[in-house]
Amino acid sequence: MRYCIQHATSADVAFMALAMDPDSGEWGSNETEHADRLLMTCASSTQVWAARDNAGTPCALWGVAPKSDDEEIGCVWLLACEQFEQEPADFRNLSGMVFAEMLGEYVQLENFVDVRKERAVELLRSIGFTVDPAATHSASGTLCHRVWLEAGNTRSLSLAERSAVLN
């Protein structure tokens, strides 16, 4: 599959909001809450990137917002459609390019990932993120891994140095 990475548009975000699993509970309890929460997350982000397939359909979003207590650290988030279940290497490569670009703005990217999301943790580890041992996240009370990536620790090239199209 061929993908193109560009800054996300409102149409990309709207499409992904509609494509979200209404039973996931991650972004709210119903489709309206999912869309509202995704829109708020995008609005607070300094960068939001979209991957589109060769038909121009959005299939992934990545974003980063400054951490509230340290604006040099970016709180990274991502959302991907099911097609990447069969194409994990493509998603890993796309993610690496986007995260490298984000590290041009932030000295570190981090977030907390629920321990039950083993595939997400392994994806982030494979890109170069450090995965800390599981601990209870104080804000949510959920057992999470802190995942983080420092600017000097990326194996990927920036979007400016690589083609934004992945074959």
Residue ranges and their predicted role:
Residues F112, T130-H145:
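Conserved catalytic-core motifs of GNAT/GCN5-like acyltransferases
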Residues M1-L18:
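A short beta-loop-alpha structural element at the N-terminal edge
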Residues L109-R125, H137-A139:
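Conserved beta-strand-loop-alpha-helix junction that forms the acyl-donor binding cleft
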Residues S45, R52-D53, N153-S156, V165-N167:
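Charged interaction scaffolds used for protein-protein
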Residues E87-E101, E122, S126:
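Conserved acetyl-CoA-binding loop-helix of GNAT-fold acetyltransferases
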Residues S45-V64:
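Conserved beta-hairpin
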Residues E71-E85:
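Conserved acetyl-CoA binding element of GNAT-fold acetyltransferases
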Residues G28-Q47:
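Active-site rim helix/loop that mediates acceptor-substrate recognition in acyltransferases
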